[in-house]
Swiss-Prot record:
Cofactor: Mg(2+)
Quaternary context: Homotetramer.
The protein's name in its UniProt record: Nucleoside diphosphate kinase
GO molecular function: ATP binding; metal ion binding; nucleoside diphosphate kinase activity
CDD domains reported for this sequence: NDPk_I
Originating gene: ndk
EC number: 2.7.4.6
Enzyme's top EC category: transferase
Family: Belongs to the NDK family.
Record keywords: ATP-binding, Cytoplasm, Kinase, Magnesium, Metal-binding, Nucleotide metabolism, Nucleotide-binding, Phosphoprotein, Transferase
GO biological process: CTP biosynthetic process; GTP biosynthetic process; UTP biosynthetic process
């Protein structure tokens, strides 16, 4: 199994609920190491650049508004099959369809306020990690 890195974002709704520590505990219990982390309040241009892949989608404007509505916690997770493992921990995008015990089933309110973002593929993860952690801000453990 390959050691990978993936980007995770704890979104404004989950930050406001004070569940960062509970979410981090799930990452670590699943064997994912947090190798970089920072809290940031995204500006509109940053959110628009990060989610540019969705620019033509009908939900783009609402997504950007939500992501700039409060601080987010951004982290790089490292471990075996980190991308897939994180996606399994997150659960389905719609918390109503998410499996019991997943982050979204436990902490998300709606398909829009769905607690977390995670890279969907190894290639995407590389670009997303570089977006938030350019240079040498990642420290292997």
């Amino acid at each position: 199994m390959a050691i990978e890195r993936t980007l995770s974002i704890i979104k404004p709704d989950a930050v406001a609920k004070n569940v960062i520590g509970q979410i981090y505990a799930r990452f670590e219990a699943a064997g994912l190491k947090i190798v970089a982390a920072r809290m940031v309040h995204l500006a509109r241009p940053e959110a628009e650049r990060f989610y540019a892949v969705h620019k033509e989608r009908p939900f783009f404007k609402d997504l950007v508004e939500f992501m700039i509505s409060g601080p987010v916690m951004v982290q790089v997770l490292e471990g075996e099959n980190a991308v897939l493992k994180n996606r399994e921990l997150m659960g389905a995008t719609d918390p109503k369809k998410a499996q019991t015990g997943t982050i979204r089933a436990d902490f998300a309110d709606s398909i829009d306020a769905n607690a977390v973002h995670g890279s969907d593929a190894a290639e995407t993860a590389q670009a997303e990690v570089a977006f938030f952690f350019p240079g040498l801000n990642i420290y292997p453990r």
